[in-house]
Amino acid sequence: MKAIQLLWEAIMEATKRERRREDDDGEKASPESLVLPPEIITEILLRLPAKSIGRFRCVSKLFCTLSSDPGFAKIHLDLILRNESVRSLHRKLIVSSHNLYSLDFNSIGDGIRDLAAVEHNYPLKDDPSIFSEMIRNYVGDHLYDDRRVMLKLNAKSYRRNWVEIVGSSNGLVCISPGEGAVFLYNPTTGDSKRLPENFRPKSVEYERDNFQTYGFGFDGLTDDYKLVKLVATSEDILDASVYSLKADSWRRICNLNYEHNDGSYTSGVHFNGAIHWVFTESRHNQRVVVAFDIQTEEFREMPVPDEAEDCSHRFSNFVVGSLNGRLCVVNSCYDVHDDIWVMSEYGEAKSWSRIRINLLYRSMKPLCSTKNDEEVLLELDGDLVLYNFETNASSNLGICGVKLSDGFEANTYVESLISPNSYGIES
């Protein structure tokens, strides 16, 4: 990668010299005088990081055309995903704590404990219209014009508010920066698309008053990005609908007989081609892992391990995640826990096993492994924690210039050129 970068810098310098010669002579260079044929330049560009390619857009028409071409973006992404060592170089951590920040994932595995962060100008970051919408949803239409409310709530406080990270896939991050607003956002290129509003179930008067959760993932069979939304229409019924980026529209799927709990307020986790939550099955009052298959758009159940239900706390609930390529669930309540339940064989109920960790927690979610699979990044009781399963050692990570808020969110993404605005357009 370093050699390619150096070669590219040499090409850039030669291109600049050629431009200066054109300016001095007052004529354009012939194709024979180009430094390298376009096809060679394309091959070199394909092996550069997405961020570097973006910086070269203004160099020439060829570079600008390639960097914004959907077909080029897909080939570039495929080269990244095909090789694990290359993919790890392009992986980033995105954190939501008042604002959105990206962290260099490799620096975590290199032993750096105070991480540098890049703040993002995500969609609607300073948009006053979203602030107005938030106030209306918060206080209700009948109080919206009350000046006393406006004195307590202001746009400055909103800009320091919450951004929900729904999920990520192939460089696109699904975020919800305000009431009713959902975006597909590429942190690498800055491209974004606001998704159309979903239709409201007939039995729901105001969606903001009802439980709702999202899940985001990629359908490789149809080359489509999908967002599934679940809304509670009663205590034991969830209304399911799905958004297709290709069609740019929502479709209602079905009703589900599940009760939500506190842990299910978190977004679903994308793993093994499906989105996962933990809900309570209404008829038997039994908690299950519910999986939404992104390709077939069907729901299926997997049992939660029986022993994991031993927690007697009345507000006990489960959070689903992934750990070293395996599905896992963790208990989250006001009692402390020290274990993680891992499914060794996906879909096999008998493959659940308990892993004890040398940490006590009330709320915890595994985020991802570092370059060394023995180390895992955890979102633990409001802290970002690096845990080593081999030595049972742990360390809290800090982010330079960022104070993590209680209940911050984090996810991983890969740097890519994929644009949410290019779908439905032939490359």
UniProtKB/Swiss-Prot annotation:
Each Kelch repeat, start to end: 224-270, 316-362
Per UniProt, residues of the F-box domain are: 30-75
SUPFAM superfamilies from the UniProt entry: F-box domain, Galactose oxidase, central domain
- What's in the keyword line of the UniProt record? Kelch repeat, Repeat
Q: Name one Pfam family in it.
A: FBA_1
Do you know which InterPro entries this protein is assigned to?
Answer: F-box-assoc_dom_typ1, F-box-assoc_interact_dom, F-box-like_dom_sf, F-box_dom, Gal_Oxase/kelch_b-propeller, SCF_F-box_component
Classify the source by domain of life.
Eukaryota
Q: What protein am I looking at?
A: F-box/kelch-repeat protein At3g06240
Q: Which organism is it from?
A: Arabidopsis thaliana
